[in-house]
Structure formats: C-alpha cells, structure tokens
Amino acid sequence: MVSVEDITNAVNRYLELVATGTADEIAALYAEDATVEDPVGGGEVHIGRQAIHGFYKNIENIPRATELHTLRVAGHEAAFMFSITVGGDGGKMRIEPIDVMVFNSEGKITSMKAYWSPAYVTTLP
C-alpha cells in the first residue's frame, strides 16, 4: 500500500528530476506500462517506459527549473500545480501546468496527465 507520504515524496522527486535529472532517472519513476499525456488533448499519449523516456529526452539538455505551488494527495492519486522554467540566455519561458498522477502499490507512476495550453506559457526576458 502506497501512503500519502510515499506519493508526496514521489512528486517531489519527480519535480527534482524534471529540473535536474536525466530521461533515464525520470522514466525510472514510472511503471513499465505507464502512460503520459502532456498536454492533455495535445495529440500523442506516450505508452510504456521506453516511450516516456523518449518524451523526457527532449528536455534533457535544456536548462530548466521547477517550483511546486500546491499538492493534493487522495488515495493513490496526486494533483499538483507547479511551474517549469525552461531555456537559457537566448530566452526563457515558464509553463504552469496542473499534473494528475496515479500510483501503483509499489509507488510507481502508472499515469500522468498534464493540463496546460499556450494560455499558461509566459515568455521571460
């Protein structure tokens, strides 16, 4: 049984790795048959750890930082709002999604959906 503390720790670890980790490290947080839809309604759903690895590989060499704004855990699920700032000296942008994750009994992410659109993207100087 996964606890509220386990899920809270997993979300914090996820945000830490999205900011500083590799695609391998982020993908390891997911169950083998997990799904990622980011953004929801954006077309492609990444199915399986290998596809999820490919998704996160896209940001691996880009400067980035994350900040958690709010987190709610209920049952085996977490919903959280955070911001991710990506880019470097050539320009930065901040995205403010709300993510919903479902966890299995081992604490692995089985589903992640990110709710955002261009309306939640800010160009930074």
Language-model features: where?
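Short, low-complexity N-terminal intrinsically disordered segments enriched in polar/charged residues
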Residues: 1-28, 32, 123-125
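A solvent-exposed, acidic/Ser-Thr-rich amphipathic alpha-helical stretch
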Residues: 4, 23-76
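A short, structure-level motif marking secondary-structure boundaries and short turns
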Residues: 7-8, 41, 83
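Compositionally biased, intrinsically disordered low-complexity segments
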Residues: 10, 14, 43, 55, ...
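Alpha-helix C-capping/helix-to-loop hinge sites
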Residues: 14-17, 37, 85
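Short hydrophobic/aromatic segments of transmembrane alpha-helices and their interfaces
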Residues: 18, 34-36, 92
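A beta-strand edge to alpha-helix "cap/lid" segment located at domain peripheries
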Residues: 53-125
